[in-house]
Amino acid sequence: MLPDGSEGELVFTSLSKEAMPIVRYRTRDLTRLLAPTSRSFRRMGKIVGRSDDMMIIRGVNVFPTQIEEIVLANASLTGLYQMHISRDGLLDTVEVHCELQPQRRGLGDAERGEIAQWVQQRIKTLVGISTAVRVFDPDTIERTQTGKARRVYDKRPR
């Protein structure tokens, strides 16, 4: 059990059955317990990510959902993005590819640069890593047969 407010993995344990083994179910969801109140049950914060999605980039724990929230916050972009992670010498580098909304097709380089800079600054502020950001026309990011885009391309040597 972690102290209140500390982020950790949500695990369910059955304690009410007698003569039954203790079974723990790992959800792999990351959350935190909120400070106790006068209620009889504890409150939990929102799910902030998944422990199996976490990547370590330059010593910072990064979840793809953090990048997704930032991309979705910009009305000029669709929710589709890709993270291309590579290693340059000893340092990890991240390039985020975003896709414009269909009505923004043909946007000039200056406007694309402003959008990319906005995303880049938000990632630096909220996630804590420096990235390069590229903004592409609609329907540029490759999708699978189900219509989803692969989110993370980790090209670092293992």
What are these regions (language model features)?
Residues 1-158:
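Active-site glycine/GP-rich loop and adjacent strand/helix microenvironment
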